Amino acid sequence: MTKQTLTQLEQHELFLTRHIGPNAEQQQEMLNFIGAESLEDLTAQTVPGKIRLPQDLTIGDSCGEAEGIAYIRNIADKNKVFKSYIGMGYYGVQVPNVILRNVFENPGWYTAYTPYQPEIAQGRLEAILNFQQVSMDLTGLDLASASLLDEATAAAEAMALAKRVSKAKKANIFFVADDVFPQTLDVVKTRAECFGFEVVVGPASEAVNYELFGALFQYTNRIGQITDYTELFATLRDNKVIVTVAADIMSLMLLKSPGAMGADVVFGSAQRFGVPMGYGGPHAAFFVARDEHKRSMPGRIIGVSKDTRGNSALRMAMQTREQHIRREKANSNICTAQILLANMASFYAVFHGPQGLKTIASRINRLADILAAGLTAKGLTLANTTWFDTISVKGADVAAINARAIAAQVNLRIDADGVFGISLDETTIRTDIADLFDVILGAGHGLDVATFDADIVANGSQSIPDALVRQDAVLTHPTFNRYQSETEMMRYIKRLENKDLALNHSMISLGSCTMKLNAAVEMLPVSWPEFANMHPFCPLDQAQGYTQLINELSEFLVKITGYDSVCIQPNSGAQGEYAGLLAIKKYHESRGDAHRNICLIPQSAHGTNPASAQLAGMKVVVTACDKQGNVDLEDLRTKAAELADSLSCIMITYPSTHGVYEESIREVCEIVHQYGGQVYLDGANMNAQVGLTSPGFIGADVSHLNLHKTFAIPHGGGGPGMGPIGVKSHLAPFVAGHTVIKPGRESDHNGAVSAAPYGSASILPISWMYIKLLGTKGVKQSTQTALLNANYIMKKLSAHYPVLFTGRNDRVAHECIIDLRPLKETSGVTEMDIAKRLNDYGFHSPTMSFPVAGTLMIEPTESESKVELDRFIEAMISIRGEITKVEAGEWPVDNNPLHNAPHTLADIMDPEFDSRPYSREVAVFPTAAVKANKFWPTVNRIDDVYGDRNLMCSCVPLSDYE
């Protein structure tokens, strides 16, 4: 008979033991090795006492998986999933089950990281390249990005690009047609204010009346009208205006492309291509421009290059445009955006093929034709004379019609001017049209869908004017024409997955990235229709489940961060930075201090920080760090005093980007506050704070939180992410608002930073589940175990590699930096060589050359077991032994396993391999552990320079994949 109590047998803390990698016995073994008695002892040795929380968090007890699922099921059931015809950029979809199961719900796709190591990311790089091909084909332009966050932020990026490339250098006006989606205008205005641009809104035809650097048009527009802008665009371009277009991706299967009309930039949401609405996200935006603007494009771009064997290979192109290199001079602060969703959209296009997509688009248009025919037959007046999917009606009794609609569980678009609209989508069927007739006309209308259909077949429809009917063939590449069978599609997805290394294969120890477990139980609710199928602009009383979830998650985050309130809207970490800095900016303006525009940033900061500051209209001043990587207090004090009249804020990261808890963090906050500035604490390293300290307790005023790092949302191969901000009470009135949905916050009047009021709301259940399941004890123990794992690796490797920075008692926080520069001096082996060699050992490289060039930053997270840590340590020690052979001259500097890494099957099958000074076994099976779990890179080291000099960002011939 067991002596355990019933409470113990109920295993409420079982999830904690599943989430944390090392078990109790392994933890004690590791603690003994590093010289600590317990996790509490390690914490006391590592974290400065003056910033330790005086008491534990109060976020509730841990709970079991079944209990957590039952609780969130209760929340989900409070959402009312009506049939939504609201449109405005969000539409019902039928996610192909082969994509839902094999991509969206597959850790091989959702747990990978941004493809900085392209040799072990060829699968998703191919899928992203397909996305770029879809974007280019449908828009009729030359060069596409790998995705942006959403349509509205893409519009803001298009405006910024227009200013950068416009030859009308004296112009400062950006024109926005008055029929764009309101959330897009909202985000554009927010961004324009920071840049000092003037935004003029008016009828599209009036754009020619202004001296502009750029203009934005919606195609099709808010009420559904389709307009041929060819002549207008030509006139604008003659006047040196950069023409940007927000386009509907599904409509472009039938409509003349914006590129053919003369647009310079085309963007939009790819949500209609198989991605659920999700109460606003996450969705991928496409962004396409003329080739001449390629150096000014925002975001990632995937390009084709060659590897050392001369084979085609994919990689991220033109990275010198981006924030991690150009910092405040970057085109955008965007890091990666929505790669998982872009991949879903690309697979949707591959699975349906051009004919299938055209059939879907034609069905939507036919149903819209039938709806319009029925309504006009009954005397209703349409507000639009052309359409793809949206019918708008004016002069009707909107209140009565909307009441009938709500009673029938139908949402219509209700405009302020007495117009209502119906946007049809892929999920609409003929019985829905009959139901809409009932809702709009009342019972007894006598209309028959089949009769109208027969008439349209016989006599045609002019909903799309002849001049706007697409004539050119699209998606002609073989990839879009060979996988329409589910068997073939399943195998294609699997072939690509097999080329990529994700967390389902091995640890990804990227410093500052927190690649922890994304537990299956946390992911389950995201696919539920109660979360997936909600329109973000539905009435709030239909979204009571989401409201409860957001409120509870916000309360969790308030307690964890020590702030007073949280804004959920930012849909990436970079957007969170931007939103937090905007709150600071507006706070200063409210006090008559609009001149405060200096942002102090330590030289060790991530490149996103200065890029975000520039985006918020601030001027960056860099402060020095000392030899230990800490903020130089004297330099900070001097610059804060010198800039006191114009000081807006400081952006700092804690623990520092050097992986240590700086002892002087409170003094940093006090100095900045003394001179009238605010403290922005970057939440990138929050995984070393939760339960031990907090930004608010330290003295910061605002932070963004990377829910895709600390709070278990997966990285998706480069997105999605979420970057909500926590603020002290004095900044709460200045966080992002929204023009469409106003839930009653004191900040509702502020502009938006994302298209949807709650950003990528459908992935919030992941973070809610993470916190709910772990509870007070679990989140603290997770942080402590992250410290343990990092210090264990640091001490194990310190006998073989110099450790660059340590804090008190020679401890590191949740990550450590090893210095490879001395080895480069003695052997010629670079950090790149070591990173690629780790691929042969079955590992993704740690972060290279950040925050210090010539280093690797290692962050194991709490989720990795001692077995996996030891396997990684063994690999690093083995690599050090290989470097020793190079140092000793046993292997040439230019012909050794590191220089030639990674090794592929083609290498070891090559008879010429025998001329190398090392064996095939050394190349591909350097340790016994590798033999047991071999990952094969599918290409050799890729030539980045060749790829940028010979830029190609579209699908390569199919033979290159064979």
UniProtKB/Swiss-Prot annotation:
Top-level EC class: oxidoreductase
Record-linked CDD domains: GDC-P (cd00613)
InterPro entries, sorted: GcvP (IPR003437), GDC-P_C (IPR049316), GDC-P_N (IPR049315), GDC_P (IPR020581), PyrdxlP-dep_Trfase (IPR015424), PyrdxlP-dep_Trfase_major (IPR015421), PyrdxlP-dep_Trfase_small (IPR015422)
Pfam family, one: GDC-P
Keyword Protein biosynthesis listed: no
GO biological process: glycine decarboxylation via glycine cleavage system
N6-(pyridoxal phosphate)lysine PTM positions: K709
Tagged with keyword ATP-binding: no
Stored PANTHER family: GLYCINE DEHYDROGENASE (DECARBOXYLATING) (PTHR11773:SF13), GLYCINE DEHYDROGENASE, DECARBOXYLATING (PTHR11773)
UniProt-listed NCBIfam families: gcvP, PRK04366.1
Functional note: The glycine cleavage system catalyzes the degradation of glycine. The P protein binds the alpha-amino group of glycine through its pyridoxal phosphate cofactor; CO(2) is released and the remaining methylamine moiety is then transferred to the lipoamide cofactor of the H protein.
Family membership noted in the UniProt record: Belongs to the GcvP family.
Assembly, per entry: The glycine cleavage system is composed of four proteins: P, T, L and H.
Protein name listed in UniProt: Glycine dehydrogenase (decarboxylating)
